[in-house]
C-alpha cells in the first residue's frame, strides 16, 4: 500500500482546475442577448401567424364574393328561365316576374315550423305572458270568450280556436250570413267568369274552384264575397247559409301572405295558395265555400273531412294533383264548418237572383252570423 505521504505529494503535483469567474456586466449582457433572441423568435412567429390569418381572411373574402356572384347569377337565371307552366301557356300567371320573386321565399317551410310550434304545449306559468301578449298585440276580445283565462289554453292552436259565448254571436235570420269574424275585402257580381278579390285584380272561377258544374239560368247570376281573417280574429269558420256540400276539393299550393296590402301586388295570389274548396248547392243553385291558406296559416281543418291533411311536406308542390272527396254535409246557418290555425281568407261563390242587395261594403268589420244581404234573396 502506498504510504499516505506519497499520496498527498502526488495530489499536490496535479494541475489545479481553473474556475472562471463571470463578472456582473457580462451576465447582464448575456441576459440581454437571450431576451433579444426570444423577441426575434416571437416576432417571427407573429409575422408567420399574421400572414396566415391574412391569407385566411383573403380566402374567406373571395369565397364570400364568389358565392354571392354565383348565387345572384343563379337567382337571376331562375327568374328569367321559362318555367314548364310558361312553356305550356305563355300567358300563365307564373310568367309575371313579381310572382316568381315572391315565390322564391321559403314561406311554406316557415309555415310548417310555425304550425308545429302552435301545437306545442306551453308551460302554465308562461301562458299568461305569451298568449296575453299576443292578445294585446292583435286586440283579441277576450270578453267574448267562454273562458277568458289564458292559463286554460294549452297551446296557441287551442287559443286561436277559443269558444265564444253564444250571446256574442247571434245568428241572423238572413238567408246569407258571415261565415267568420273578419273584414270584407270584396263582394259583388262575378263578371265574365272572373272573381275580383281586390279592386283591379281578379282570377278565373275555374282556376280557383276547379271544374264545377254551374247551371246556367237566366234568372240567376254568380256572386262572390271575400272575407279576410286577421291574426287576432276568432279562427273557426261557420256555415253562411242553409246548404249542402257534396264535394271537398283540396288544392295543394303555396302559403303566401294574403294581407290586403300585398294582394294588389301579386296577381292571382288566391290561385297560387293552398286551399280547401267545399262545393255544393243551396236554394238558388250552386254554392261554394273556400278556405284559403296563407303564410303561417297552413293548417286547415274541415270537420266533415277528418282525413284532410294540409301544410305538409311535398315534392314539387305545384305539380301535385288535387284531391277530391265526395261528401254529404248538410249545413245550417251558423253551424261550425272548420277552423284555421291563425288567420286567412274565406271566399264564398254562389248563384243568386239579380235582385240581391248586399248589406256590406268593402272594409267593413264582420262577426260570424252577421247578415250579408239586406234583401232580394
UniProtKB/Swiss-Prot annotation:
Modified-residue entries (Pyruvic acid (Ser)), positions: 344
Residues on Mitochondrial matrix side: 35-61
UniProt cross-references to NCBIfam families, sorted A to Z: PS_decarb
One GO-annotated biological process of the protein: protein autoprocessing
Post-translational modification: Is synthesized initially as an inactive proenzyme. Formation of the active enzyme involves a self-maturation process in which the active site pyruvoyl group is generated from an internal serine residue via an autocatalytic post-translational modification. Two non-identical subunits are generated from the proenzyme in this reaction, and the pyruvate is formed at the N-terminus of the alpha chain, which is derived from the carboxyl end of the proenzyme.
Recorded GO MF terms: phosphatidylserine decarboxylase activity
Keyword check for Phosphoprotein: no
Role: Catalyzes the formation of phosphatidylethanolamine (PtdEtn) from phosphatidylserine (PtdSer). Plays a central role in phospholipid metabolism and in the interorganelle trafficking of phosphatidylserine.
Pathways per UniProt: Phospholipid metabolism; phosphatidylethanolamine biosynthesis; phosphatidylethanolamine from CDP-diacylglycerol: step 2/2
GO cellular component, one term: lipid droplet
Top-rank taxon: Eukaryota
Quaternary state and interactors: Heterodimer of a large membrane-associated beta subunit and a small pyruvoyl-containing alpha subunit.
Listed InterPro entries: PS_Dcarbxylase, PSD-B, PSD_type1_euk
EC number annotated for this UniProt entry: 4.1.1.65
Coiled coil: none
Protein name from the UniProt record: Phosphatidylserine decarboxylase proenzyme, mitochondrial
Site positions (Cleavage (non-hydrolytic)): 343-344
Protein species of origin: Caenorhabditis elegans
Topological domain spans for side Mitochondrial intermembrane: 81-377
Signal peptide as annotated in the record: none
Catalytic activity annotation: a 1,2-diacyl-sn-glycero-3-phospho-L-serine + H(+) = a 1,2-diacyl-sn-glycero-3-phosphoethanolamine + CO2
One Pfam entry name: PS_Dcarbxylase
Transit sequence range: 1-34
HAMAP family from the UniProt entry: PS_decarb_PSD_B_type1_euk
Catalytic site: 181 (charge relay system), 238 (charge relay system), 344 (charge relay system), 344 (schiff-base intermediate with substrate)
Amino acid at each position: 500500500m502506498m504510504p499516505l505521504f506519497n499520496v498527498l505529494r502526488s495530489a499536490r503535483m496535479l494541475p489545479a482546475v481553473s474556475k472562471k469567474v463571470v463578472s456582473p456586466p457580462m451576465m447582464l449582457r448575456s441576459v440581454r442577448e437571450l431576451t433579444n433572441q426570444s423577441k426575434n423568435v416571437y416576432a417571427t412567429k407573429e409575422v408567420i401567424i399574421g400572414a396566415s390569418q391574412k391569407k385566411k381572411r383573403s380566402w374567406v373574402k373571395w369565397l364570400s364574393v364568389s358565392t354571392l356572384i354565383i348565387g345572384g347569377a343563379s337567382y337571376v337565371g331562375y327568374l328569367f328561365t321559362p318555367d314548364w307552366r310558361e312553356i305550356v301557356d305563355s300567358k300563365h300567371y307564373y310568367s309575371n316576374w313579381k310572382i316568381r320573386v315572391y315565390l322564391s321565399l321559403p314561406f311554406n317551410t316557415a309555415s310548417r315550423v310555425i304550425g308545429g310550434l302552435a301545437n306545442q304545449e306551453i308551460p302554465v306559468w308562461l301562458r299568461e305572458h305569451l298568449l296575453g301578449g299576443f292578445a294585446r298585440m292583435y286586440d283579441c276580445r277576450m270578453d267574448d270568450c267562454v273562458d277568458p283565462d289564458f292559463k286554460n289554453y294549452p297551446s296557441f292552436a287551442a287559443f286561436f280556436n277559443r269558444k265564444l259565448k253564444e250571446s256574442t254571436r247571434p245568428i241572423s235570420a238572413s238567408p246569407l250570413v258571415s261565415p267568420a269574424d273578419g273584414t270584407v275585402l270584396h263582394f259583388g257580381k262575378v263578371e265574365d267568369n272572373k272573381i275580383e278579390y281586390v279592386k283591379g285584380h281578379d282570377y278565373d272561377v275555374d282556376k280557383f274552384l276547379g271544374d264545377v258544374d254551374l247551371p246556367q239560368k237566366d234568372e240567376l247570376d254568380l256572386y262572390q264575397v271575400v272575407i279576410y281573417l286577421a291574426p287576432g280574429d276568432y279562427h273557426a269558420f261557420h256555415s253562411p247559409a242553409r246548404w249542402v256540400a257534396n264535394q271537398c276539393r283540396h288544392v295543394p299550393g303555396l302559403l303566401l301572405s294574403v294581407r290586403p296590402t300585398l294582394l294588389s301586388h301579386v296577381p292571382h295570389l288566391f290561385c297560387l295558395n293552398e286551399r280547401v274548396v267545399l262545393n255544393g248547392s243551396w236554394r238558388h243553385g250552386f254554392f261554394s265555400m273556400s278556405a284559403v291558406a296563407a303564410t303561417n296559416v297552413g293548417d286547415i281543418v274541415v270537420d266533415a273531412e277528418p282525413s284532410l291533411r294540409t301544410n305538409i311536406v311535398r315534392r314539387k308542390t305545384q305539380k301535385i294533383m288535387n284531391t277530391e272527396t265526395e261528401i254529404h254535409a248538410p249545413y245550417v246557418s251558423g253551424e261550425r264548418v272548420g277552423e284555421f290555425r291563425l288567420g286567412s281568407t274565406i271566399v264564398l261563390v254562389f248563384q243568386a237572383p239579380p235582385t240581391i242587395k248586399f248589406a256590406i261594403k268593402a272594409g267593413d268589420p264582420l262577426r260570424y252570423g252577421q247578415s250579408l244581404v239586406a234583401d232580394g234573396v
